[in-house]
Each structure stands twice: as structure tokens, then as C-alpha cells.
């Protein structure tokens, strides 16, 4: 589980599923399955937010010919503060989902052999609900932004990150 600080939930759930098999818990209760799935969705959201907004967005928002001093997350914050802010908030939302389902934002212990060690309380669920639609809208907005960027210069993206090896 402590192999990675970006995707510890994936490692945690893989370990829990391995132990499930060892102890003969081939089926876990439906609620536990949903909590584990929600935990993993939180992981996916926060991990993808880090990847896109902090690591990849400079390449999509600025040309490759842009200076390295500008084509980075600081440049995104300067030129596209709303996009940068959304990335931070999307990641935080994903981490809150993890915290509520796994006990901590990083290296949680929510999945145990045969299920999970707690359910999501009504108060915890209600904590997540108000921002859910906004988070989904921001995700859709990024897809629109990528589509616009691609359509403006498909050749740029056709060979993006491809390296001829022989």
C-alpha cells in the first residue's frame, strides 16, 4: 500500500482483494463493494486531476515551442487561474472521498479482509453531495477544452508524446 503516494488506494484495494481470496471471502457484502468502489473512484479523480492539471495541461494549453520556464503548472496558474484552481479543487474532492471511505487521504485502511471497516454515514454523504455536480461539470469542461485544442491543431496531438524507437 505504501508503494505510491499518488495512487495508494489502488495498492490498498489490490492487497485487500488478495487477502479476501486468502481468507475465503470470495464475495463481500454489497455495501462494502460500493464503499470500495467509491474509494477507488475518489482515487481515480484525484490521480487524474494531478496528472492532467499539474503535469499534462501545460502541454495542452501552451505550444511545445513555449519556454520551459512558462510551460509548467506555474504558467498555467498565471495564464489560466480558473483551470489551475479547478485542478486543485478536483483533487481535493477526490481526496475527501478517499478520506471518508478509507480513513485518511493517503494510505488509508478502509478495506479489510471481507469488506470495509466502516460505512459512509449520512453526514459524510451529505458533505460530498453539494459539490458533486460542480466537479462533474468541471470534468466535462476539460473534455470540451481538449476537443477544441485538438480540432484547432490535430497534427500537434496526433504525434503528441510519440517517440520513434527504431
Q: PLM features: what roles do these ranges have?
A:
Residues 1-166:
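Active-site bordering "gate/hinge" segments
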Amino acid at each position: 500500500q505504501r508503494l505510491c503516494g499518488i495512487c495508494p488506494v489502488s495498492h490498498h484495494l489490490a492487497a485487500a482483494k488478495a487477502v479476501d481470496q486468502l481468507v475465503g471471502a470470495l464475495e463481500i457484502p454489497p455495501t462494502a463493494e460500493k464503499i470500495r468502489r467509491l474509494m477507488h473512484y475518489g482515487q481515480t479523480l484525484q490521480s487524474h486531476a494531478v496528472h492532467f492539471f499539474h503535469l499534462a495541461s501545460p502541454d495542452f494549453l501552451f505550444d511545445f515551442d513555449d519556454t520551459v520556464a512558462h510551460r509548467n503548472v506555474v504558467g498555467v496558474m498565471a495564464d489560466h487561474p480558473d483551470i489551475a484552481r479547478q485542478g486543485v479543487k478536483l483533487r481535493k474532492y477526490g481526496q475527501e472521498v478517499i478520506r471518508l471511505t478509507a480513513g485518511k487521504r493517503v494510505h488509508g485502511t478502509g478495506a479489510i479482509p471481507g469488506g470495509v471497516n466502516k460505512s459512509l454515514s449520512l453526514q459524510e454523504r451529505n458533505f460530498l453531495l453539494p459539490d458533486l455536480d460542480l466537479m462533474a461539470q468541471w470534468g466535462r469542461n476539460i473534455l470540451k477544452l481538449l476537443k477544441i485544442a485538438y480540432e484547432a491543431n490535430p497534427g500537434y496531438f496526433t504525434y503528441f508524446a510519440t517517440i520513434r524507437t527504431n
